[in-house]
Amino acid sequence: MGGDKIKKDKRQKREDYRAAMRKDDISELPRKKFYRQRAHANPFSDHQLIYPPHPDQMDWSSLYPHYIVDEPTTTSPPPPPPVPEQTPSEPDLTPLRPKPLSKEVSVADIGCGFGGLLIALAPTMPEALILGLEIRVSVTHFVEDRIKALRAQNQAAGLYRNVGVLRANTMKFLPNFFRKAQLEKVFICFPDPHFKIRKHKQRIVSTTLNSEYAYVVKPGGIVYTITDVLDLHEWMVQHFDAHPSFERVSEEEQEADPCVAIMRTETEEGKKVERHKGEKHVALFRRLEDPAW
């Protein structure tokens, strides 16, 4: 009984802390200990997720409010169509029209974790809208609160307005969020290695998923990968090399890319590998032009 009470008290403290962080006047950076969660989540589980049926129905305005475009209003708007009578068993499922933005998301960090890469990329790529995708609830909340605090702390400079985070299962719903050839850069940093052979199907790089990356990444765009697990690195290289829509970027070009240095040093997992004197294996893959047929 005593152990259950301690767990309950800790849970209540976490909930109270997160509720306090959600207040508008809070600019303090969140503390990780109040957002702890398991290191990985099963992507095949039925998570309680909300996702658009089509990218055109995704409303990005809550993530990037400073990029909302005010639509011109007409002096005499047309009357609305008649609304059919509905019963409680027949809810109105008509999708709301998303608020337009001045630009679209062009950079995605798949499995963004606690947001280290997002925060490092934001000021170095001020013209790009950058999105972190994370399946774990508490970790997503941490990144949300982190971005909120950084925006408040840097309000005068207008920093971190171009970065957002979304809870999503990219193994299932990536094309629901992004149109064909929308993304210029995709980062896959220190993904779950799933060491057991029977779990390899859960790896974030596979023949099937690489086709989805090929769909959302524009020709000339880059997929960045990094891991401290050699077996996983070789797996990712093998599967991207085997895909007709990608070619591996040369090591010379790779090392000249400023995003590679950021990817190596700014993610939380990368810093952990550094502390333990581990190796970091990097590979970049360029999206090729589609055949002209």
UniProtKB/Swiss-Prot annotation:
Entry GO CC: nucleus; tRNA methyltransferase complex
InterPro entries for this protein: SAM-dependent_MTases_sf (IPR029063), Trm8_euk (IPR025763), tRNA_(Gua-N-7)_MeTrfase_Trmb (IPR003358)
Annotated Pfam families: Methyltransf_4 (PF02390)
Entry's EC annotation: 2.1.1.33
Broad class of where this protein is predominantly found: nucleus
Catalytic-site annotation from UniProt: 192
Gene (name only): TRM8
Organism (species): Chaetomium globosum (strain ATCC 6205 / CBS 148.51 / DSM 1962 / NBRC 6347 / NRRL 1970)
Keyword tRNA-binding: yes
Name used for this protein in its record: tRNA (guanine-N(7)-)-methyltransferase
